[in-house]
Regions:
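Condensing-enzyme catalytic core mediating Claisen C-C bond formation in acyl metabolism
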Residues: 1-57, 166-239, 243, 326, ...
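Short coil/turn connectors at secondary-structure junctions
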Residues: 3-4, 80-84, 111-115, 139-145, ...
Length: 339
C-alpha cells in the first residue's frame, strides 16, 4: 500500500548507561560452555554482537519513552499540544495496564483529544506503528503523530544467565535461551506528519506485509523468559522475507537492489543478516548495522538504526531507504522511505 502525503519529521533516541560486553556474558557462562564443550568465542562468532546496553535496575520504561519522545517533539519544532496521535510499540511494559501510551501521554501533558494506545507485534511493532499512524494522518484524524518505544532487556538476560548456571541445565536449554542473550535495550521516538506540513524531505512512500502464523510458536517470551527455536525461526523468517520482497517489488516504486541505496533491517545478529542478504540477493555493503554495539533491541531496532545512519551522514537527503522487519509470529513488513 502506498502513502501519498506522509513525512518523517523527526527521530530521537536514548541509549542506556550500562554497557555489557559479550565477553562479560561469556565469563559468567564459562562453566556452562565448558560443560557442553562450546567454544568460548562461539557467541561472538555467531552473533557478531560485541556489546549491548542495559538501563539501571528498575528504571521505568515509560520514563525512558517519555524522555526520548520529548526530544522528538522538540526536534520536530512543534508544541506538545499539536500531537494528535500517540502510539507506543514497546514490547517492554511497566504494567499490563494502563497502557504505556497513556503513561507517556500523561507525562508529556498531551491534550485530551490526542488519541493514545499501545500497538504490539513483537519486533515489527514500530513499522506497524508507522503504517497505522500514517493511515490515520492521511485520513484526517490528526496532523501530527508521535511513535514511542522503550525496550529493557536487562532483567530477562540476567534471569536467563541465572537459569543457565544451574547444574541441571541441558544443552537444549542453552540453545533455546541463546537468542535471549543477544537482546539489548534502547528508547526511540518519531514524529510523523503530513508531507504538506513537513519541514523535511523525508517521505514514507509505502509498505507491504505478509504473515506466516503457522510458525507463531518458534519464539515465545515473557518478562522473565524467552524460548526460541533459532534455526527454524531463521529459516522460516528468510522464506517469508523472500515472499514479501516479491510483493514489494510489484507494489513499491524502485523496490530493487539497483533502486535501493540503504537497507535498514531488524537487527538480530551476524548469521541472521548474512542469511537474509543471501536469500534476497542484496548487497551486504548497503546494510546499515547496529547490532554489533547494541544487540537486538526489538521493535526499537529499525528506527534506532535509521537514526544512527542519518546522524552519521551515511543516509543522506534524497536516498532511497528500505526499512525491513521480521517479527515473531511470523510477520514481515518492508517499507520504502525517501530520505
Amino acid at each position: 500500500m502506498n502513502f501519498h502525503d506522509l513525512a518523517i519529521e523527526s527521530i530521537a533516541y536514548e541509549l542506556p548507561p550500562v554497557a555489557v560486553s559479550t565477553e562479560q556474558l561469556v565469563r559468567r557462562l564459562d562453566p556452562v560452555l565448558r560443560r557442553f564443550k562450546i567454544p568460548v568465542d562461539a557467541m561472538l562468532q555467531l552473533t557478531g554482537i560485541i556489546e549491548r546496553r542495559f538501563w539501571t535496575r528498575g528504571h521505568p520504561m515509560h520514563l525512558a519513552a517519555t524522555d526520548v519522545a520529548r526530544r522528538a517533539i522538540q526536534r520536530a519544532g512543534i508544541a506538545p499540544g499539536q500531537v494528535g496521535i500517540l502510539i507506543s510499540t514497546s514490547v517492554s511494559k511497566d504494567y499490563l495496564e494502563p497502557s504505556m501510551a497513556s503513561l507517556v501521554h500523561g507525562d508529556l501533558g498531551l491534550t485530551q483529544e490526542c488519541r493514545n494506545f499501545d500497538l504490539a507485534n513483537a519486533c515489527l511493532g514500530f513499522l506497524n506503528g508507522i503504517e497505522v499512524a500514517g493511515r490515520m494522518i492521511e485520513s484526517g484524524v490528526a496532523d501530527y503523530a508521535l511513535l514511542v518505544d522503550g525496550e529493557s532487556a536487562g532483567d530477562v538476560v540476567e534471569a536467563t544467565i541465572t537459569r543457565l548456571q544451574d547444574p541441571s541445565t541441558t544443552l537444549r536449554d542453552f540453545w533455546e535461551a541463546f537468542a535471549t542473550l543477544t537482546l539489548g535495550s534502547a528508547a526511540v521516538a518519531m514524529v510523523l506528519t503530513k508531507g504538506s506540513l513537513s519541514q523535511t524531505t523525508h517521505r514514507v512512500n509505502g509498505c507491504v506485509s505478509l504473515a506466516d502464523t503457522a510458525n507463531s510458536r518458534l519464539c515465545m517470551g515473557t518478562a522473565e523468559r524467552m524460548v526460541t527455536d533459532s534455526t527454524r525461526l531463521l529459516k522460516a523468517g528468510v522464506v517469508l522475507a523472500q515472499k514479501t520482497w516479491g510483493v514489494a517489488s510489484n507494489q513499491l516504486n524502485r523496490w530493487s537492489e539497483q533502486g535501493i541505496g540503504h537497507y535498514i533491517c531488524h537487527q538480530v545478529g551476524a548469521s541472521h543478516m548474512q542469511a537474509l542478504v543471501e536469500a534476497l540477493g542484496i548487497s551486504f555493503a548497503k546494510c546499515v548495522l547496529s547490532y554489533p554495539t547494541h544487540g537486538n533491541v526489538g521493535p526499537a531496532a529499525v528506527p534506532l538504526t535509521l537514526a544512527l545512519a542519518t546522524e552519521s551522514g551515511r543516509v543522506k537527503e534524497g536516498d532511497h531507504v528500505a526499512l525491513m522487519g521480521i517479527g515473531s509470529g511470523l510477520n514481515v513488513t518492508m517499507m520504502s522511505v525517501t530520505w
